[in-house]
């Protein structure tokens, strides 16, 4: 199976400008394509992960990726998919974020001679002459057409600044510049970027009389139509200091049953034959599928060792696995009363709660688990035999301890 057909089977393609041309280019390893990343934060997120894996798939098929760091366009802010204006960042913030992106992307994509290249659009956008740009590029854009673009429609009622209105022109200019300077003949991006990408192909056609192509990637949404990649309203980061490998693993381990196979098909590099077989799994087997998804993605982002440790930690906490990677809290015989220790004492001794009253409050609010079971009885106690084997306690989502009597 060739790469274009694989992308179709994995459900990754949303829209294309010229299907046959794109099909032939990427199947024959003739595409030099780019994907842009505006550096609005100091880390990539799970939302970017989709684009990174696409770049990897296409590179493995012989095509050459161009990773565009949006050091210049970030100063404007992309209005696509937003109902409010993005926070303005300083040049220093943007430069710092761009460097963070560079370091992270080098972990996923192979850069070097005749491999992937990385460019920053600040290198050409910041030196543009405004009058020259208006004369050379502005004449190629119809305001009427721009206002009909989906990326602007959502903002018209709340107000769209002239600054943001220029974003389409800047992104289109990126494609034009990359086509001229690097022979970049194709752009990939999220489905919400379609209007901006068409602007680039049109600019190249009008200015150079050449054909360039665009393809959008299917947005990763759950069964309710909501974008995936956030937990409790917070982004799932690829930086281990912002989202730990364990939390990253748990995010994917906890996807809904209805979403797990979609995620495996779109995000992992497992063979399609294996995925088709997994798609027949039901009931308890879906938990195995979720473990597979979480392990494969964590391995890609954080490495095999971290993925294995996260999996073992999750299994220890939620049952059935080694407790090697769960932090220990050691207690002694002197901590027992009549050969037992109650749950509130263990929460305090382990450092999971500051006091017995804090422990009581957490239990009453449903925030304490022993293994996989929620603790509801504040008088629950454990004898010496249980404690010598070790008891895994959890407070909230991120605080775990294995309490062991030694």
PLM region spans:
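NTP-dependent nucleotidyl-transfer catalytic core
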Residues: 1-193, 198-201, 207-213, 226, ...
């Amino acid at each position: 199976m060739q790469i274009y057909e694989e992308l179709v089977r994995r459900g990754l393609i949303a829209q294309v400008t010229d299907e046959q041309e794109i099909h032939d280019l990427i199947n024959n390893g003739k595409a030099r394509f780019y994907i842009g990343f505006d550096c609005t934060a100091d880390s990539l997120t799970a939302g970017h992960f989709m684009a990174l894996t696409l770049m990897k798939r296409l590179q493995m098929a012989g095509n050459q990726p161009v990773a565009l760091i949006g050091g210049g366009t970030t100063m404007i802010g992309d209005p696509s998919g937003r109902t409010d204006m993005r926070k303005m960042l300083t040049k220093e913030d943007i430069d710092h974020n761009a460097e963070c992106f560079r370091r992270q992307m080098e972990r996923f994509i192979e850069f070097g001679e005749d491999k992937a290249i990385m460019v920053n659009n600040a290198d050409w956008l910041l030196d543009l002459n405004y009058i020259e740009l208006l004369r050379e590029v502005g004449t190629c854009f119809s305001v009427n057409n721009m206002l009909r673009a989906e990326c602007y429609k959502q903002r018209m009622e709340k107000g769209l600044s002239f600054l943001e209105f220029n974003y389409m022109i800047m992104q289109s200019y990126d494609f034009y510049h990359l086509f001229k300077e690097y022979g970049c003949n194709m752009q990939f991006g999220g489905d919400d970027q379609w209007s901006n990408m068409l602007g680039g192909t049109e600019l190249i056609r009008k200015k150079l009389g050449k054909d360039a192509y665009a393809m959008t990637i299917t947005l990763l949404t759950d069964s309710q139509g909501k974008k995936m990649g956030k937990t409790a309203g917070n982004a799932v980061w690829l930086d281990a200091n912002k989202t730990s490998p364990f939390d990253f693993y748990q995010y994917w381990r906890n996807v809904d049953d209805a979403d797990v196979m979609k995620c495996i098909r779109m995000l992992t590099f497992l063979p399609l034959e294996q995925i088709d077989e997994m798609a027949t799994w039901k009931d308890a087997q879906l938990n195995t599928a979720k473990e597979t998804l979480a392990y494969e993605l964590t391995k890609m982002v954080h490495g095999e060792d971290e993925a294995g440790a996260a999996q073992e930690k999750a299994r220890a906490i939620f049952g059935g696995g080694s407790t090697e990677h769960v932090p220990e809290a050691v207690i002694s015989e002197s901590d027992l009363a009549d050969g037992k220790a109650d749950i509130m004492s263990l929460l305090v001794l382990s450092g999971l709660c500051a006091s017995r009253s804090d422990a009581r409050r957490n239990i009453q609010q449903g925030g304490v688990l022993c293994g996989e079971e929620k603790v509801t009885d504040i008088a629950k106690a454990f004898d010496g035999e249980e404690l010598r084997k070790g008891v895994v306690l959890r407070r909230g989502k991120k605080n775990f301890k294995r309490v062991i009597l030694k």
